[in-house]
A protein has these predicted regions:
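Bacterial Sec-dependent N-terminal signal peptides
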Residues: 1-23
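Generic beta-strand/beta-sheet core signal
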Residues: 44-47, 62, 95, 150-152
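Cap/lid segment of the alpha/beta-hydrolase catalytic domain
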Residues: 55-138
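Short alpha-helical segments and helix-capping/turn motifs at coil-helix boundaries
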Residues: 46, 77-80, 156-161
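Conserved beta-strand positions that form and line the central face of beta-propeller blades
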Residues: 33, 61, 146
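Primarily recognizes the serine-hydrolase "nucleophile elbow" in alpha/beta-hydrolase
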Residues: 52-58, 68, 134-170
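N-terminal cap/lid segment of alpha/beta-hydrolase-fold proteins
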Residues: 22-54
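Conserved G/P- and acidic residue-centered "switch" motifs that form tight phosphate/ATP-binding loops
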Residues: 39, 99, 151, 155
């Protein structure tokens, strides 16, 4: 009896674990290390609608809290700010900020915007967002050239910090 129980437990665990990792209906996940103007690469997870007959806006969240789950076959349980957004057909993008989790560079807590940059390679949160959106528009084929940024708490800080010298797509 205990062998049967063990076999059923193993089968059930493996079956439901594999089901939990299936792709999000209607989306394909890509991962990229996006180069910033100073050469630092930021880890980015991109969820693209499978329907390529339309062009979609980009909805970006930059976070110090991890954009896990990592791996192109591992999908977030929910895309966007809440479940209502999942049927709205955005290209959802999540990015680990500098020095956090899978991204390169040094993390600087609540870094202020730099009004005057000493060189074209000097960065702040606004320039990292700009470079990210520039890369996404150039490399994700079915985008419509528009982007939005959102966040609550620390990701909300990153959304606000992206506004000085913002990318024109925002």
């Amino acid at each position: 009896m205990s062998k049967l129980f063990l076999l059923v437990t193993i089968y059930t665990t493996l079956h439901f674990t594999s089901c939990a990792q299936q792709e999000k209906t209607g989306y394909m996940k890509k991962e990229a290390m996006i180069s910033m103007r100073d050469g630092v690469k930021l880890f980015t997870a991109i969820y693209i609608p499978l329907n390529t007959s339309e062009k979609y806006p980009i909805l970006l969240q930059r976070t110090p809290y991890s954009c896990a789950p990592y791996g192109e076959n591992n999908y977030k349980k929910r895309l966007g700010p809440n479940s209502f957004f999942e049927s709205e057909n955005y290209i959802y993008v999540y990015q680990d900020v500098r020095g956090r989790y899978m991204s390169e560079g040094n993390f600087e807590e609540m870094a202020p915007a730099k009004d005057i940059k000493k060189s074209s390679k000097e960065t702040d949160e606004s320039s990292d967002t700009y470079d990210t959106i520039e890369w996404l528009i150039a490399n994700i084929s079915n985008n419509n050239g528009r982007a939005g940024i959102y966040g609550i708490s620390y990701p909300g800080f990153y959304a606000t910090a992206s506004l000085p010298n913002a990318h024109p797509a925002i």
